[in-house]
Amino acid sequence: PFTLGQLSALKVYSTEENALADRCLDFSKTSNTMVLGEAAACLSLSLLSENAIAKISGIGFATEVLSSGTSISSDAKCFQKSMKMAIGSNKLEDIDAIVMHAPGTIQGDATEYEAVKIIFGNNLPMLTSNKWKVGHTFATSGLLSLELAILMLQNQYFIESPFYKNSTCKKLKKILVNAVGFGGNAVSILVEL
């Protein structure tokens, strides 16, 4: 009740009561639609590639000065910096998809999307998020997004958001995963098999 009360007071929590209440990546929404989920996740990182199910080939992180702890700049400078760092020397066209943070808020979804458009221009990778299905799980959301990326790579199956239609579908080789925390702390991870 406390966390829901806080999010409601900030006016970021969804007031919809249906199965798809979190409408992340729905750029036509007129109200915030963030919904909480609950999850736990763990992973094992190793410098050795033996028995690895995936490889992290790039890591990026950045922060930005914000006017409040829940805000983000209109072009998500923190995401621009973290994505550029994670992509590194890879060609932009080699990034097949992005699992976006996309919390379901008008500002959060739009600013991250703007950052993606600034980095990739007219050649956007396929975009998705898992929050329409599992809600925002706070600290676990980044790991769940990483898990989604790995599952899509392993199965060569892109899991699309019902609210955003991608124009192309291609073989999945490299997927970028974005996450951001309150206060403008962004992380991007490039993953491949």
Give, region by region, the residue ranges found by the protein language model.
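Extended C-terminal subregions enriched in glycine
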Residues: 131-140
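Acidic-glycine-rich active-site phosphate/pyrophosphate-binding loop
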Residues: 6-22, 110-127
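Conserved beta-ketoacyl condensing-enzyme motif
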Residues: 1, 92-110, 120, 174-175
